[in-house]
């Protein structure tokens, strides 16, 4: 699995937390970081889209992270991840730049998901997606990390 993101995650607590979760995921969640583009908003989105899609093989199963995507709960994401993995295609999670994803990325994506209605810094989105993929794998393997219900 690969996470392809615009921007660099600097050393610090966000990177440490990302690495903590990414290191638990099997197969490993690797990262490709792409330099942010410059220009008008539309030009940035167009250039970022070309870079993001260019970092994915033609047969990639692309999961775009976008505020307009579906908002699965953890159990539903676990089902989705299982289905994606069963496809045999390499899974690529795409995170756009500050201006969001170009429509060409949304159109190419096999799935578009959102982490909710709140706006998250791009560096935290990396941590959140790594944790949720780890959680999904824990759910799918019966690991006790995820607790669906809590006693009253």
Swiss-Prot record:
InterPro entries: Alpha/beta_knot_MTases, RlmH-like, tRNA_m1G_MTases_N
Main location: cytoplasm
One GO term describing the cellular component: cytoplasm
Pfam family, one: SPOUT_MTase
UniProt entry keywords in alphabetical sequence: Cytoplasm, Methyltransferase, rRNA processing, S-adenosyl-L-methionine, Transferase
Keyword check for Acetylation: no
Reactions accelerated catalytically: pseudouridine(1915) in 23S rRNA + S-adenosyl-L-methionine = N(3)-methylpseudouridine(1915) in 23S rRNA + S-adenosyl-L-homocysteine + H(+)
Subcellular location: Cytoplasm
Transmembrane as UniProt keyword: no
Origin superkingdom: Bacteria
Chain sites annotated for binding S-adenosyl-L-methionine: 65, 96, 115-120
Molecular function in Gene Ontology: rRNA (pseudouridine-N3-)-methyltransferase activity
Function: Specifically methylates the pseudouridine at position 1915 (m3Psi1915) in 23S rRNA.
Subunit-level organization: Homodimer.
Family: Belongs to the RNA methyltransferase RlmH family.
Protein name: Ribosomal RNA large subunit methyltransferase H
Classification lineage: Bacteria, Pseudomonadati, Pseudomonadota, Alphaproteobacteria, Acetobacterales
Gene that encodes it: rlmH
